[in-house]
Amino acid sequence: MCLQQLVISWVSLVWLASPLLAIWELEKNVYVVELDWHPDTPGEKVVLTCDTPEEDGITWTSEQSSEVLGSGKTLTILVKEFEDAGHYTCRRGGEVLSQMLLLLHKNEDGIWSTDILKKKEPENKNLVTCEAKNYSGRFTCWWLTAISTDVNFSVKSHRGSSDPQGVTCGEATLSAERVKIEQREYKKYSVQCQEDNACPTAEETLPITVVVDAVHKLKYENYISSFFIRDIIKPDPPKNLKMKPSKTPQQVEVTWEYPDSWSTPHSYFSLTFSVQVQGKKKKRSNTLHVDKTSVTVTCQKGAKVSVQARDRYYNSSWSEWATMSCP
């Protein structure tokens, strides 16, 4: 990951004395130092270069200390703790010449830290969940965090690795929804992405990769999710759920339609449906699976009929339920 993301800035060069090259540019003037988090680790030696053609009269300071750290166009620092990260500024007299921010990415015993995000379900390995309503190449990813302040997320995505194809993602936004896990409330962030040259009918051979960069104060982490669109399909619920009496007492004919967001033509992108009847005592009847958009069921007063949809030809996720009370 480090070598793939390394960007060398010829204007304001930041490099590492270590041959591991464990520093890279996250965005302009923001750098991530990848650090072994162990008491015996000597730390990483980093050389910062001031963005100026001048050579003399330059001093360096940081937000962690009010003292002058050094003078000259370059400053060598040893990064070992979070106290060594933060903003570094070079000045000449009272003029700020350039400023850069160092973030730390912790590696403990060969495992990168994952402290910022929270799993909704312990058995789920992914901290980032992605879903698509259809095969248009548009999908939504979301994640949870308990952190309220000083947290920022950015998202990038592509399909394939050797010759990556473009996927455009918007800005991560905070949802009004709050999720409770083990009596604790978590905030939910989400992002919308669109494959640039999606072909809904084409067979997928290369997965899409989504990378979420997370920054909390001076800590950096990243989270990667890789998938095929067919694996993350979750249709919207069926629409226009209706009932009409049948000739047989206490039976009704239930009808519905494909959701508007589902791919067309429906003869090619077909759905299958699950139908359940819930009585007053909230006991489920046997589940009915049908491919058509109607079914006749026994429906006593006070019961509820629910219908959900799934891709007919691929074992992806079921939609949420569409529900209607029996007359």
Swiss-Prot record:
Residues 237-327 form the Fibronectin type-III domain. Gene3D superfamilies: Immunoglobulins. It comes from the Eukaryota. It is found in: Secreted. Residues 1-22 form the signal peptide. It holds the Pfam family IL12p40_C. InterPro entries: FN3_dom (IPR003961), FN3_sf (IPR036116), Hematopoietin_rcpt_L_F3_CS (IPR003530), Ig-like_dom (IPR007110), Ig-like_dom_sf (IPR036179), Ig-like_fold (IPR013783), Ig_sub2 (IPR003598), IL-12 (IPR050676). GO terms for molecular function: cytokine activity; cytokine receptor activity. This is Interleukin-12 subunit beta. It comes from Marmota monax.
